């Protein structure tokens, strides 16, 4: 059982995740799929791994790059939008953004977009000239405008950006968009994409203590193994040996399949393959059409290359 009063151990890995928000559940699911077991009480901001020397800190997402930059945490799971905003903020203050982006992760996808009111006539980025644009990402927006030679006023808000035009605080907004439903509810529409974002794994710039290095390597390997197989399927089937060339062409995104002779059937084989693309019903029907039988499709939970 986790002990919330326990003091941090300097030889235990510390990983920062968003306390509450769109990345929280997916971040914790990723760690669980990597084998981490922990207990978390209500409002508990630090959890201790029960089967790994790894502790999870629950913090505001925009604090995660700072904690990793300052070596308070060894690793962080955070949105690329936050990482890019912090890099530019550090650079503006003359601070080298030393934390390293280790891996792009397959969740938390969204776009940082310019959105305009429904009645606004948008004719390209030059339509932003002289406008007031509300955002919580002033550095990313500022760079976007500067790169295009656009002079506009950046209005910095900490939240509820979508309502700024209706309140007269801004003409347009620059905010994260996932489905677009919030924009529509506030009579806004997408005009320009500033940044494509997703969750990323970042790492401290400070050399990790020897006691932590092995578990860091193992955790990164496990994360890679979990991410590799998202959407992958394991296919098993029986087929005539003569049908192997046709079957190999039909298996989506697979390496060379494993072919196993069937006992007492010299003309038939079992075929096993990991497919890294979606396997649709049409694929199964085509496999059956070239002679495959007993076709079985299984999800792949994890894989080490």
What are the roles of these predicted feature ranges?
Residues 2-54, 78-106, 111, 120-305:
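Small-molecule-sensing regulatory modules
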Residues 66, 111-115:
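Signature of uroporphyrinogen-III synthase
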Residues 53-75:
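Short, structured active-site "lid" loops
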């Amino acid at each position: 059982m986790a002990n919330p009063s326990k003091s941090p151990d300097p030889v235990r890995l510390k990983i920062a995740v968003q306390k509450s928000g769109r990345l929280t559940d997916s971040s914790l699911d990723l760690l669980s799929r990597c084998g981490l077991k922990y207990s978390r009480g209500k409002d508990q901001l630090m959890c201790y791994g029960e089967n790994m020397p790894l502790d999870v800190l629950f913090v505001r997402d925009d604090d995660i790059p700072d904690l990793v930059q300052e070596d308070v945490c060894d690793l962080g799971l955070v949105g690329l939008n936050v990482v890019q905003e912090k890099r530019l903020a550090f650079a503006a203050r003359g601070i080298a953004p030393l934390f390293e982006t280790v891996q792009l992760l397959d969740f938390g996808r969204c776009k940082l977009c310019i959105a305009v009111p429904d009645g606004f006539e948008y004719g390209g980025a030059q339509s932003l000239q002289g406008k007031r644009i509300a955002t919580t990402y002033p550095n990313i927006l500022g760079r976007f405008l500067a790169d295009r030679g656009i002079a506009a006023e950046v209005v910095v808000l900490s939240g509820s950006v979508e309502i700024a035009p209706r309140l007269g605080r801004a003409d347009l907004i620059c905010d994260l968009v996932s489905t677009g439903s919030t924009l529509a509810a506030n009579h806004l529409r997408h005009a320009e994409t500033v940044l494509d974002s997703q969750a990323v794994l970042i790492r401290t710039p400070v050399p990790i203590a020897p006691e932590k290095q092995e578990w860091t390597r193992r955790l990164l390997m496990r994360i890679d193994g979990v991410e590799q197989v998202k959407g992958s399927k394991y296919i098993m089937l029986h087929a005539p040996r003569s049908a192997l060339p046709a079957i190999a062409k039909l298996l989506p995104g697979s390496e060379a399949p494993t072919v196993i002779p069937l006992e007492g059937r010299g003309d038939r084989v079992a075929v096993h393959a990991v497919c890294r693309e979606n396997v649709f019903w049409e694929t199964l029907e085509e496999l059956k059409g070239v002679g495959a039988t007993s076709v079985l499709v299984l999800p792949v939970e994890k894989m080490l290359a």
